[in-house]
Amino acid sequence: MAKADSEYDFIFLSVRHGFVKEAVETLRKNNIKGTLVFFCNFWNTRKEVQEWAGDYDYILAFPTAGGHMQEDHLDGVLFDHLMLEGEQKAHISNYADLTALLVSADLKWEVPHDMVEWIWIHMAINAGVTSTAARSGNLENPEELALNLMNSSSELSLAIKAIREALKVVEARGVNLKLYKAELLPYKIPAWIAGKAMKVMFAKNELTRKIMTLHNDKQDIFYCCQSV
């Protein structure tokens, strides 16, 4: 546990459903210092993120991961790559130290056109997937809903269509989706083909399947869907 009046090279903030601001305030009140790495979803603007950070140096990043807390136990899975804001936009003096840390942990990273916009897009995709999954059962068992979705090409096709609708919300915020062609390519092909391809992918890729079943924090899911 971090102690009050302590200092770190980096502080990774990966908190649930919109509590980033509160997490930063907790650090500030306890005089815990270090470069903040915002490592989670948010539906806020860059200006708002800057206001959260205040006098902290910060950078935006996002893990390819899934999981949930059960009491004091974290059950999750983390891929070997993540999304990371480019050095030009981050404006932190220890960017090289951060990338060296990632290399030492055998983690690779990609730099999107804009990290805030990428997170909005990620939230829209999540909202499309989870809202489709919720159609088929009881919200008290998110893991079962995820399994039902991954095992049905027709439901996955509906998820593709829902994602397309959710992405229109992101576009309405002024995001040029053409700058994210690689990320959005799977959602451009005919929905029925994409649904079949995704079913095969989920069947063969154990880690991706694990992310879907472990990402079952209802409040986090609601935050994502309600924000979009």
Across the structure, where does each feature detected by a protein language model lie?
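Soluble or luminal CAZymes and related metallo-dependent hydrolases
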Residues: 19, 41, 90-94, 158, ...
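Short Gly/charged-rich anion-binding patches and loops
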Residues: 22, 44, 97, 165, ...
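Rossmann-fold dinucleotide-binding core
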Residues: 45-128
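Helix-loop-beta segment of a Rossmann-like dinucleotide-binding subdomain
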Residues: 73-86, 136-149, 204-215
